[in-house]
């Protein structure tokens, strides 16, 4: 396997060199062609997806992420068309100046080169990643999870068909075997891969970070908090909490822990009442549990254990903790946050300003849902993930974050004397 994968990396690297010479118009045409081809590929993709789904328990939080259907494929095709309409992130002049010796300097955006993606049971990521990487001039190596391997294989074949039809080296995109050994080879491919982005659980991200020699940008895992301040509007709190928890509980911007100021506990039954509709299980600390008893369904209410406050649930589960001050809320977030998305609900301008200033996260909200952490919602177009680190990229990683830069220097015979 090792030799085969290394040969794959060489082919992808060659394809990345060829990709540099493909113009923006040609890239956009390929993306439009792919969007129009998805309906033709849908039967083979959905058949493969069904085989993957048959091996997974429908109660598994990953089931919804794995699921593809006609509607989701239509949305994917629309997203790809949207990427085609976005401005190219390449060849943008970031700096330009003329030196006293006559040299002309330009700093321009360029592709990163070869981007590796390690991800779990999310076959839609295969389409998203390809579209964004192609638009930004990057070749791509994919290492998907075994749960989605048949879906990913069908999707990659659909994409490669489009590449070949447009005269593009189909090694621009390669899918590695689903075995764990392939991930290890990829993480050490410093001569072949320029950057790796893991998308998935904290366990996956930790594995990549601890074992990679290739530079890594961490994305995805979100232990997300919303703090209800003592001066919060109860109606806004109820609406925001319901949306943040139940819109899509299996995604990384979904709410995991609700922090409630002790002075606001009397309103907790009203705030959590809408969650009953979706049968959200609440793990409450003693004070919150006592307040919810008799108002929240007994079958959905449990006492919280310490581990509940460090868990990304990815399902219809929510931990609730009572705090005595904004300071205690900030301390709790600092201890448990994955630095993804954090929110405060308050009518107090000073509390809001303090929270927004002091919380260390990629995205910090006031009086709105954390569900907005999304490249499309930010007006960035599609995203390749949500970076939770600080170097190179932070927050939604869109086209700009998939580029680097280089200096172009032009002269007419100048030589350096000193």
Curated annotation (Swiss-Prot):
Entries under Pfam families matching the protein: Aldedh
InterPro entries the record matches: Ald_DH/histidinol_DH (IPR016161), Ald_DH_C (IPR016163), Ald_DH_N (IPR016162), Aldehyde_DH_dom (IPR015590), G-glutamylP_reductase_CS (IPR020593), Glu-5-SA_DH (IPR012134), GPR_dom (IPR000965)
Pathway(s): Amino-acid biosynthesis; L-proline biosynthesis; L-glutamate 5-semialdehyde from L-glutamate: step 2/2
EC number of the protein: 1.2.1.41
Keyword Ribosomal protein found: no
Keyword Phosphoprotein: no
Keyword annotations of the record: Amino-acid biosynthesis, Cytoplasm, NADP, Oxidoreductase, Proline biosynthesis
Family indicated by similarity: Belongs to the gamma-glutamyl phosphate reductase family.
Role noted for this protein: Catalyzes the NADPH-dependent reduction of L-glutamate 5-phosphate into L-glutamate 5-semialdehyde and phosphate. The product spontaneously undergoes cyclization to form 1-pyrroline-5-carboxylate.
Record-given protein name: Gamma-glutamyl phosphate reductase
Species per Swiss-Prot/TrEMBL record: Chlorobium limicola (strain DSM 245 / NBRC 103803 / 6330)
């Amino acid at each position: 396997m090792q030799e085969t994968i290394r040969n794959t990396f060489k082919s992808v690297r060659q394809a990345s060199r060829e990709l540099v010479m493909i113009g923006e118009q040609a890239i956009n045409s390929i993306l439009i062609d792919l969007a129009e081809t998805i309906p033709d590929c849908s039967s083979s993709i959905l058949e493969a997806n069904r085989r993957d789904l048959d091996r997974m328990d429908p109660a598994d939080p990953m089931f919804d992420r794995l699921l593809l259907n006609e509607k989701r494929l239509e949305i994917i095709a629309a997203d790809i068309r949207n990427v085609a309409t976005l401005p190219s992130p390449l060849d943008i002049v970031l700096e330009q100046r003329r030196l006293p010796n006559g040299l002309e300097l330009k700093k321009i955006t360029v592709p990163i080169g070869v981007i590796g993606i390690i991800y779990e049971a999310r076959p839609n990521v295969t389409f998203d990643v390809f579209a964004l990487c192609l638009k930004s001039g990057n070749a791509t190596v994919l290492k998907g999870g075994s749960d989605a391997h048949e879906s990913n294989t069908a999707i990659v074949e659909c994409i490669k068909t489009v590449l070949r039809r447009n005269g593009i080296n189909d090694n621009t995109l390669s899918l590695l075997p689903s075995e764990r050994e392939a991930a290890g080879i990829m993480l050490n491919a410093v001569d072949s891969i320029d950057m790796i982005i893991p998308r998935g659980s904290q366990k996956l991200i930790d594995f990549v970070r601890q074992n990679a020699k290739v530079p890594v940008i961490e994305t995805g895992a979100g232990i997300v908090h919303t703090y209800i301040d003592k001066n919060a509007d109860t109606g806004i709190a109820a609406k925001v909490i319901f949306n943040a928890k139940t819109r899509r509980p299996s995604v990384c911007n979904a709410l995991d822990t609700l922090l409630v100021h002790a002075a606001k506990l009397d309103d907790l039954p009203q705030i959590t009442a809408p969650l009953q509709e979706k049968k959200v299980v609440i793990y409450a600390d003693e004070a919150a549990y006592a307040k919810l008893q008799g108002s929240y369904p007994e079958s959905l209410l449990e006492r919280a254990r310490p581990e509940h406050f460090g868990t990304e649930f990815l399902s219809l589960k929510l931990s609730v903790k009572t705090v005595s001050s904004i300071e205690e809320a900030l301390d709790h977030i600092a201890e448990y946050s994955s630095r993804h998305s954090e929110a405060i609900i308050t009518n107090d301008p000073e509390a809001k300003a303090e929270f927004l200033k002091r919380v260390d996260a990629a995205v910090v909200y006031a009086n709105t849902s954390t569900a907005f952490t999304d490249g499309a919602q930010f007006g960035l177009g599609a995203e390749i993930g949500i970076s939770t680190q600080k170097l190179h990229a932070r927050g939604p990683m869109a086209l700009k974050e998939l580029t680097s830069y280089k200096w172009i220097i032009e002269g007419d015979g100048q030589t350096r004397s000193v």
